[in-house]
Design a protein with these regions (language model features):
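Linker/hinge segments immediately adjacent to helix-turn-helix/homeobox DNA-binding domains
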Residues: 1-16, 32, 72
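Residues marking the start of alpha-helices
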Residues: 8-10, 25, 52
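A short, Lys/Arg-enriched amphipathic alpha-helix from helix-turn-helix/homeodomain DNA-binding modules
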Residues: 12, 19, 27
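Conserved catalytic core of two-component sensor histidine kinases
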Residues: 15, 22, 46
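Cytosolic histidine kinase catalytic core of two-component systems
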Residues: 16-17, 59
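Pre-recognition alpha-helix immediately N-terminal to the DNA-recognition helix
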Residues: 19-23, 63
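Short helix-to-turn junction characteristic of helix-turn-helix DNA-binding domains
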Residues: 25-29, 68
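Recognition helix of helix-turn-helix DNA-binding domains
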Residues: 28-63
């Protein structure tokens, strides 16, 4: 799954931080956990998540996970 995330990150021009957050999202973690783990505000985590969704052209966690798991 890590390789798929790296491929997506490179293909969709995700930043290093967005790639890091995508990894957590793919493991099922939400913005609160991510913000505490990465020592950023919840609002910042949510902004990164919105940017990831926009760049990957997905609108839900389900779509995101399908893309990460190679089903889209």
């Amino acid at each position: 799954q890590h390789e798929r995330i790296v491929t997506l990150a490179n293909g969709y021009a995700l930043t290093k931080r967005e790639r890091e957050i995508l990894q957590y999202l793919s493991l099922g973690y939400g913005s609160v956990y991510i913000s505490k783990t990465l020592f950023i505000s919840d609002n910042t985590a949510r902004t990164h998540i919105r940017n990831i969704y926009r760049k990957l052209d997905v609108s839900s966690r389900e779509e995101l996970l399908s893309l990460v798991n190679g089903m889209k």
